[in-house]
Structures are given as structure tokens and as C-alpha cells.
């Protein structure tokens, strides 16, 4: 390596013993290379989704099983321009959950996607130091089924004032549409009993009370209101 010129001389040999080195000519006789420091930095990584699931289903959640950070090593000039690392997942037509590898997408600070040639200069490892072969990350995609017209129920405690009685309780809306894992839906037993308890102790007039359905849904893992609700 000629440090002054930044070139490496080329040498060509011939396996035919009848051909002497003096008879071999080639061009160019050297190649110019650029050397720079190799550095490593940690970056956050997140899964993104595009497309729509099959009718009657909804995306529950998506998670990169390799962790939410990666270590990227490579030429300093290339590492410095990295701005965003994601794993795009196409959920078009999906009706079942899956665990599968997906290509890692790297964007520079101008929002441009790094080319395959640029990515080939990089080494990507998870936070444990395990290399992500072929720049692929393993993603868990959970698809939930939609359940329509799930009736709402509330619990009341206490008694109205003497001389009064409860003629009825009206819930508006009467039902909701839920996206849920099958096991969670079975746990609900076909209805959603709101966690908030309504006290009717000593009341003498009709009352309007507002309850947040999400306060109850948040007690479960794997269920939420339908996205369009």
C-alpha cells in the first residue's frame, strides 16, 4: 500500500509455466482506495406497518423480537448520516398472527433510504451483540379478530332514598365493537362489565354518569375498542 498515493499495486500471475512474468501486461497496475475509521453506534429500531388486514381483523400490536435498539458498525462517514432505522411490515390481507424475518430499512438525515451497496458496508447487531444476518430482524405481528355488538353492563351499589326506587338503568351506547385476542374475548364471556361501580345510595333524582370504557379495557392485555369506534 502506497500511503502517499493511496494506491495498492496489483499483481497478476499465470498458471501456465510457459508464460513468463515479462510477457504479462495489464492495466491498471494499481487501484486507488480510501480508508477511514470503523466506528460503532447504537440506534433505536422500530417496526412500522402498512396495508390493511383481512376484513373482520385488525392489527393488535407489532414487536421486534431482537429488541428496540441495534448496534451498527461501519465507515465513520456512513454511520454519521444514519438518522432512522425501521423494519417495515406489510399486513395486507393478514388474518393470523405471525413471527417472521423482515429486512431492516435505514434512512439518512435527508430521509433517503440507504442502498444495498451502502448497507453491505455495515454490520448490524442486536443489543446482545448477535449479528443480524442479511440485515433482517424478527418481528412478531399480532392480528386480532373483531367482535361486534358486545353489550355493556354496569354494577350498582346502595339503595335510593326512602320512597324512591330505580325504574331502570340505560346505557348509551348499549354495546361496543372490540378487537381482541380470542383468549381475552372468551374471558369476557360475551359482555363487557365496566369496572366502575355506580353508587345509587340515597339518590332522589335521575342522574347522568359518564364512564370511560377504556378504563375497563386497560385492565386486560390483548383487547381494545375497534379502531374506527
Language-model features: locations:
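Structured interface patches
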Residues: 1-229
Amino acid at each position: 500500500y502506497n500511503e502517499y498515493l493511496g494506491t495498492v499495486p496489483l499483481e497478476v500471475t499465470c498458471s501456465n509455466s510457459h508464460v513468463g512474468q515479462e510477457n504479462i501486461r495489464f492495466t491498471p497496475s494499481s487501484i486507488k482506495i480510501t480508508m477511514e475509521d470503523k466506528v460503532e453506534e447504537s440506534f433505536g429500531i422500530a417496526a412500522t406497518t402498512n396495508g390493511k388486514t383481512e376484513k373482520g381483523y385488525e392489527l393488535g400490536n407489532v414487536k421486534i423480537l431482537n429488541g428496540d435498539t441495534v448496534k451498527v458498525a461501519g465507515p465513520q462517514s456512513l454511520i454519521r448520516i444514519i438518522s432512522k432505522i425501521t423494519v417495515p411490515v406489510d399486513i395486507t390481507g393478514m388474518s393470523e398472527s405471525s413471527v417472521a424475518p423482515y429486512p431492516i430499512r435505514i434512512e439518512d438525515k435527508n430521509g433517503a433510504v440507504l442502498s444495498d451497496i451502502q448497507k453491505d458496508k455495515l454490520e448490524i447487531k442486536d443489543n446482545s451483540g448477535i449479528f443480524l444476518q442479511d440485515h433482517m430482524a424478527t418481528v412478531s405481528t399480532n392480528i386480532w379478530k373483531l367482535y361486534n355488538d358486545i353489550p355493556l353492563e354496569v354494577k350498582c351499589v346502595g339503595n335510593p332514598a326512602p320512597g324512591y326506587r330505580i325504574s331502570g338503568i340505560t346505557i348509551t351506547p348499549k354495546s361496543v365493537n372490540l378487537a381482541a385476542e380470542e383468549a381475552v374475548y372468551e374471558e369476557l364471556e360475551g359482555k363487557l362489565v365496566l369496572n366502575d361501580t355506580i353508587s345509587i345510595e340515597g339518590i332522589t333524582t335521575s342522574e347522568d354518569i359518564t364512564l370511560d370504557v377504556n378504563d375497563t379495557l386497560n385492565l386486560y392485555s390483548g383487547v381494545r375498542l375497534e379502531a374506527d369506534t
